[in-house]
């Protein structure tokens, strides 16, 4: 339910790391030493897609509710977005990937300290464009005394520059944000498919979605090689390569990588590419974890064969398909199913790292 500040119940508006943010914390349903799950949203969307809260909203239609039932506390983070009606001050046009990672880490540390959580371990989930901020978040979190034990990509894009041509309709708002495109039919079609997959009840009415769930995005986050120039009040080419901002090839500073990816043709790009893209980064992350010294005496041993099999099987084991499209975690049955898959993936990630350590110790 929204209040006079256009915030939903349980949301907090704050300025953290120099920029506005809205965050939502949901405690675990029972005392636990499980890591805090941090959910970071994607392009054009508030983190409300993880927890809902609009008038008439049903909590069980959203992921945060079911993760709390699994024993996790959940922190959902919205970066600076420009919305109508306004939710945050529109002061984030120059918000960069590095700012995103720092803001998310600072907010995470704040919640862990304020809520007196027993664990300083974190599992990061980021959706869609949120895949670009994983390394900056992990570095900033480590500097704050936090341990990011695992990353789970949700139909997420790694921090490479877009290999596709610039899409049409990129326009700059008066505040310097990338405007919500006039046609968001792709997103609406995907939400409709999720409605059908979840038994037919509307989860987010179209008018509510357009008014309260999406907003203009800082252009630098999108990976198009653009930034906002306050002098010309327009988007211009960014002199900093996107890969330098995202540090996507700094594999040593990734946590253990895992992924949930959609299977619907309505999100064909992620359905086709996510296993390969995150599997690629996972493999190089594992190579970095293993190191040359660890394998120097393994030639011809059974342990070397087991290590090869463990690494080669990792993308299949840790990158898991999920029924649905870009919003595969929205809707009661989908949200409940995905929460269970998240819990299983965290357990499997822990077991995987234990098995790897046993081979290279």
What is each model feature region?
Residues 44-58, 86-95, 166-168, 269-278:
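Short, flexible/disordered intra-domain loops and linkers
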Residues 28-79:
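Short, surface-exposed "cap/lid" segments of acyl-processing enzymes
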Residues 151-162:
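Active-site nucleophile loop of the alpha/beta-hydrolase fold
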Residues 287-361:
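Catalytic active-site module of serine/aspartate enzymes centered on a nucleophile-bearing elbow/loop
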Residues 124-134:
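Gly/Ala-rich beta-loop-alpha elbow adjacent to hydrolase catalytic centers
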